[in-house]
């Protein structure tokens, strides 16, 4: 691994990096740490074998950009292109039901396994745990969208009530194909400390045009804070 990679630093060094960024931009260290993890997981997701079928829809929270921190309330919202399940064109009610079940099972099985493997491959398996949303009962046997939670080991002792060290991915099939653009994403640590390598992989993120406004607000946020 690169010597200066954030993830191979000691806990004390990681704390120093996060505190330095906090001093620079005034956001709490917990938020800076979570931002780095959300960025990293998003980059890893777009290396998965079916990444060409995924679109990052953003996190709805940034519409409330006045409350900077609310960026973190919903972390990674992903749409899966229905062509992955062999469905095209206008769908009947029955096909939509089939699509939702297929998507739900895909997230619980294939997506979960592929993401677990990738987290191992990039050397982060000891730093976080990953768990899929379980099947529900009756009509909700196959939750759709289905969530996956990634809990990372925070290097900060104190926890903020409104900001847990958990990243929630919400993954669902969409019946509409949305316009998207390819973007790269940068964490607040990367923005403020270019000397520290934070990317485990610098992938291109297919971002829904609606989600792009989310990314733009994130970048606006970075500009506001990195003056």
Model regions: which residues?
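N-terminal regions immediately upstream of nucleotidyltransferase
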Residues: 1-40, 86-95
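Catalytic cores of NTP-dependent nucleotidyl/adenyl transfer enzymes across multiple folds
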Residues: 2, 13, 19, 39-42, ...
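Short secondary-structure junctions and interdomain/linker hinges
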Residues: 25-28, 48, 118, 122
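Short secondary-structure boundary/capping segments within folded domains
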Residues: 29-30, 44-48, 69-70, 158-159
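Short secondary-structure transition/capping motifs
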Residues: 30, 34, 68-69, 100, ...
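Active-site nucleotide-donor binding segment shared across nucleotidyl transfer reactions
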Residues: 46-88
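Catalytic palm subdomain of template-directed nucleic-acid polymerases
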Residues: 80-105
């Amino acid at each position: 691994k690169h010597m200066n990679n954030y993830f191979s630093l000691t806990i004390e060094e990681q704390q120093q990096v996060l505190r330095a960024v906090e001093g620079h931009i005034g956001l709490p260290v917990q938020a800076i740490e979570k931002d780095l993890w959300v960025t990293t997981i998003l980059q890893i997701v777009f290396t998965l074998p079916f990444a060409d079928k995924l679109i990052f829809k953003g996190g709805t929270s940034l519409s409330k950009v006045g409350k900077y921190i609310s960026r973190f309330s919903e972390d990674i919202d992903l749409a899966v292109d229905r062509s992955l399940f062999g469905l095209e064109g206008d769908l009947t009610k029955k096909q939509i039901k089939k699509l939702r079940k297929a998507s739900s099972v895909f997230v619980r099985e294939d997506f979960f396994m592929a993401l677990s493997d990738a987290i191992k491959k990039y050397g982060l398996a000891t730093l976080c745990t990953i768990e899929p949303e379980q099947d529900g009962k009756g009509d909700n046997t196959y939750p759709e969208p289905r969530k996956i939670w990634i809990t990372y080991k925070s290097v900060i002792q104190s926890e903020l009530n409104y900001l847990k060290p958990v990243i929630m991915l919400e993954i669902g099939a969409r019946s509409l194909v949305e316009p998207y653009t390819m973007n790269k994403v940068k964490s607040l640590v990367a923005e403020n400390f270019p000397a520290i390598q934070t990317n485990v992989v610098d992938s291109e993120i297919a971002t829904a045009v609606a989600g792009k406004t989310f990314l733009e607000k994130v970048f606006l946020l970075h500009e506001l804070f990195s003056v």
